Amino acid sequence: MPTTVTEFDTITAISTPPGEGAISIVRLSGDDSLAIIKRVYRGKDLDKVASHTINYGHIIDPKTDAVVDEVMVSVMRAPKTFTREDVIEINCHGGIVATNRILQLLMSYGARMAEPGEFTKRAFLNGRIDLTQAESVMDLIRAKTDRAMQVAVDQLDGSLTHLIKNLRQEILEVLAQVEVNIDYPEYDTDEMTTRILLEKAELVKGRIGELLQTAQQGKVLREGLATAIVGRPNVGKSSLLNHLLHEDKAIVTDVAGTTRDVLEEYVNVRGVPLKLVDTAGIHDTEDKVEKIGVERSRAAITKADLILLVLNQSEPLTIEDRELITATTDKKRIIILNKTDLPNQLDLDELQTLVRADEVIQTSILTSEGVTDLEAQIAKLFFGGIENSQSTVMITNARQIGLLNQAQQSLDEVISGIAAGMPVDLVQIDMTNCWDKLGEITGDSAPDELITELFSQFCLGK
């Protein structure tokens, strides 16, 4: 990967969300950044100001000398910038007209509209960050919980980079030793070379395995946990959704069948980002609209990572309750016995024959009784108490998981090849493949098409 790139043109983009707001930021990056901003800026001589300073002034239209906006201009000179290029950031008043007018002026004097993710891509190509750090930028932007934010910040600081580079160094050292032993066989025996390869393959495989064990938790932090709230009509599903959200998103009445569709909301439960789905009550109905809602509810159960199955403790179990218990047996689930504020009519002995005791939480959504226990159970079920852990090195996306699996497969080939008595130079190929796959994670050996695809997923101006 190059450590510096100088052939880029100068790019610009609005880095803040569109629409009305207190402040908008327009960003420039490239060799001509200072020259371009000087054409449209009236204030201090920016050639003479110190780097990493903010300067008051006005953006003007040079053709008419009309003031476009009152601004603060940040000047950041290469190489100590995010892109390792000269960077200018214009803080102007929020809004669509002024912000876009400034953008158009910059483009009219030589800047090009940046592609999505191009600022971060330049940071990567100029050696400022690697691919794991680039991905963590997007993870940080999209983080829905403090835990997800902390994992992203640690990866941006290089926690995963450091770990992967150490693994690659372990492999590189053994490959170098094998090369020496192959070139100078008089100083080595086949047994010694294969022993070195085997020990290193098993060591690196173990460390990759430890990383892969974090994949599910990392995926949950990054994408959210698809959680379906299910149950027959009027057992308290929508009340539970509203309680977790702390706002009234679902209609709550004592009329069965009020929720006729699937409602989705994100909520942070003790560091676990839940993508909550409040489903229509599952029951037999002749209403065409309700039937559609029921079918969508069944589909939501199939797709869900976690099921919150709500039962009404103030009524005996029904056929529909039993069907839902059976339908969710193979899913991660929590059985919520709601309405504990009312006299119990549910046969708990029968329930114990249908579900495990550790799946059951008793609640009254109306009085908030048991909701804290429910939240604790969700955190325990998926993070096993690690939500307070200081260790934040996690695999957070499918690309990283896939490459680690491929690297591990190459190590399996090394181990099986040695066991089968294969020549060292053939076994060495699989070890090199592992080294390459780990390099793709950080971008040291990633193909150009992958890099282009990855950065195209970023937002404009980042």
Curated annotation (Swiss-Prot):
The UniProt record lists the EC number as 3.6.-.-
Q: Which residues form a coiled coil?
A: none
Q: Among its keywords, does the record have tRNA processing?
A: yes
**Oxidoreductase as UniProt keyword:** no
Any Gene Ontology CC annotation: cytosol
Instruction: Paste the cofactor note.
Output: Binds 1 potassium ion per subunit.
Keywords assigned by UniProt?
A: Cytoplasm, GTP-binding, Hydrolase, Magnesium, Metal-binding, Nucleotide-binding, Potassium, tRNA processing
Q: Locate the residues binding (6S)-5-formyl-5,6,7,8-tetrahydrofolate.
A: 27, 89, 128, 462
Which BP terms from GO are recorded? tRNA methylation; tRNA wobble uridine modification
Residues involved in GTP binding: 234-239, 253-259, 278-281
InterPro entries assigned to the protein according to its UniProt record, in alphabetical order: G_TrmE (IPR031168), GTP-bd (IPR006073), GTP-bd_TrmE_N (IPR018948), GTPase_MnmE (IPR004520), MnmE_dom2 (IPR027368), MnmE_helical (IPR025867), P-loop_NTPase (IPR027417), Small_GTP-bd (IPR005225)
A GO molecular function term, named singly, is:
GTPase activity
Q: Which family does it belong to?
A: Belongs to the TRAFAC class TrmE-Era-EngA-EngB-Septin-like GTPase superfamily. TrmE GTPase family.
- Subunit structure of this entry? Homodimer. Heterotetramer of two MnmE and two MnmG subunits.
Q: What is this protein called?
A: tRNA modification GTPase MnmE
Native source species: Latilactobacillus sakei subsp. sakei (strain 23K) (Lactobacillus sakei subsp. sakei)
